């Protein structure tokens, strides 16, 4: 039997071996034997009372002592241009929602996202509409934008020109110098939040010569955040109006910058 193209219970092989749903609802996925999208990695987590659900694309934090609940993705990269999205689904007014990239050093050393020199993150502080902050090497930089529950944060990593950009609800954020991000600006890195270190410099050390996508959460209360690496869903909720994606690889809420693609086995190959 063959199930494809959204026909989740209808056999497309011509043999009539149709399926029936025994209970619950089905969530369509873009994953296939020839193209697997990145997910969050249940074997690469530190801190907090976190669990993963919904295809390992949702991080659920339960009430605990104040901890950074930190989890990496399953696919890494050391070149190319990559885009994904994180949605702050729910939480308390004191929540910090974080997203970015890191080497494996963070989880290996039980660090939080942005604590190491080869780790780059943006955190949105919900309380009172507080401004977001970026971190690398444990150093905090306040940014001129805030985000909170319901917002969708886009991440664009240009690993050819060593730059990282963040968007909020489809608009590229301005960095600490008040320059709006332009992910397609190439070597000029216009509005990039950081010039990231070249992963090739770590090629032969214990932490590997690549970056991983990461999400992190800080607070003592419950919260939920979901990632969309290209399957077109935040948890079980489909994107409301898919943006353009010239690569044709993956479905996202907002437009994928020209030259960028989803982090998947097809994208990597």
Regions found by a protein language model. Give the residues of each.
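PRY/SPRY (B30.2) beta-sandwich protein-interaction domains
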Residues: 1-269
């Amino acid at each position: 039997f063959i199930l494809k193209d959204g026909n989740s219970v209808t056999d497309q092989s011509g043999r009539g071996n149709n399926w029936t749903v025994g209970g619950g609802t089905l969530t369509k996925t873009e994953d296939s034997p020839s193209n697997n999208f990145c997910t969050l990695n249940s074997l690469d987590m530190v801190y907090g009372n976190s669990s993963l659900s919904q295809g390992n694309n949702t991080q659920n934090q339960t009430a605990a002592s104040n901890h950074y609940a930190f989890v990496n993705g399953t696919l890494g990269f050391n070149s190319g241009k990559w885009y994904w999205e994180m949605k702050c689904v729910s939480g308390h007014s004191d929540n910090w929602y974080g997203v970015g990239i890191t080497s494996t050093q963070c989880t290996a050393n039980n660090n939080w996202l942005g604590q190491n020199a080869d780790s780059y993150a943006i955190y949105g502080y919900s309380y009172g509409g507080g401004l977001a902050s970026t971190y690398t090497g444990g150093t905090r930089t306040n940014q001129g934008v805030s985000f909170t529950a319901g917002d969708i944060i886009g991440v664009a990593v240009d690993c050819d020109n060593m730059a990282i950009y963040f968007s909020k609800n489809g608009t590229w954020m301005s960095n600490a110098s008040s320059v709006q991000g332009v992910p397609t600006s190439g070597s000029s890195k216009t509005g990039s939040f950081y010039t990231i270190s070249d992963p090739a410099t770590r090629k032969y050390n214990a932490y590997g010569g690549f970056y991983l996508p990461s999400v992190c959460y800080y607070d003592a209360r419950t919260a939920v955040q979901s990632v969309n690496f290209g399957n077109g869903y935040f948890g079980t909720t489909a994107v409301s109006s898919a943006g353009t994606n010239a690569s044709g690889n993956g479905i996202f809420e907002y437009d994928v910058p020209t030259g960028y693609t989803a982090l998947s086995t097809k994208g990597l190959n």
